[in-house]
Amino acid sequence: MVPKLFTSPICLLLLLGLMGVEGSLHAKPRQFTWAQWFEIQHINMTSGQCTNAMLVINNYQRRCKNQNTFLLTTFADVVHVCGNPSMPCPSNTSLNNCHHSGVQVPLIHCNLTTPSRRISNCRYTQTTANKYYIVACNNSDPVRDPPQYPVVPVHLDRVI
């Protein structure tokens, strides 16, 4: 007997398990809006060294993130990019809320080299470059995001 797709309890548990894993990898901490989380992950490099800077992000997510890119620019400058023409997002072409920076910015890419269950033991290498970037933008949270920004970056889709 072959179980029917999505009606079998086993298939349902597998599907829910996969969704849970996927969701946890892309989840933001509840206390932040998507724009605030974007700023923490991609603008606010609290230290010039990836290992120290990633500790902030990893503490919120309670795991060592495999890689991350910090744009060495201001949140206001990235918000300005949201005003550039919309384009399909390279990582998901069904979404049309991405915007190309139009100018290169300095950035630091952090790559996990020493994973650990203990967040403070995770180690990263870093690479610096000047690159264009593509961000996804959405309407801001009218209560929790700065009122001067009606549209805000919510996802760093790609660096080029």
UniProtKB/Swiss-Prot annotation:
Cellular location(s): Lysosome; Cytoplasmic granule
Cystine connections: 50-110, 64-122, 82-137, 89-98
Cellular component GO terms, alphabetical: extracellular space; lysosome
Pfam families (alphabetical): RnaseA
Keyword check for Ribosomal protein: no
Record-listed E.C. numbers: 4.6.1.18
Glycan attachment sites: 34, 44, 92, 111, 138
Annotated keywords: Disulfide bond, Endonuclease, Glycoprotein, Hydrolase, Lyase, Lysosome, Nitration, Nuclease, Signal
Key word Disulfide bond present: yes
Residues that bind substrate: 65-69
InterPro entries associated with the record: RNaseA, RNaseA-like_dom_sf, RNaseA_AS, RNaseA_domain
Catalytic reactions on record: an [RNA] containing cytidine + H2O = an [RNA]-3'-cytidine-3'-phosphate + a 5'-hydroxy-ribonucleotide-3'-[RNA]; an [RNA] containing uridine + H2O = an [RNA]-3'-uridine-3'-phosphate + a 5'-hydroxy-ribonucleotide-3'-[RNA]
Residue numbers bearing the 3'-nitrotyrosine modification: 60
SUPFAM superfamilies on file: RNase A-like
Main localisation: other
Residues the record marks as active site: 42 (proton acceptor), 155 (proton donor)
Signal sequence range: 1-27
GO biological process entries: chemotaxis; defense response to virus; innate immune response in mucosa
Its job: This is a non-secretory ribonuclease. It is a pyrimidine specific nuclease with a slight preference for U. Cytotoxin and helminthotoxin. Possesses a wide variety of biological activities.
Family recorded in the similarity comment: Belongs to the pancreatic ribonuclease family.
Name recorded for this polypeptide: Non-secretory ribonuclease
Species of the source: Macaca nemestrina (Pig-tailed macaque)
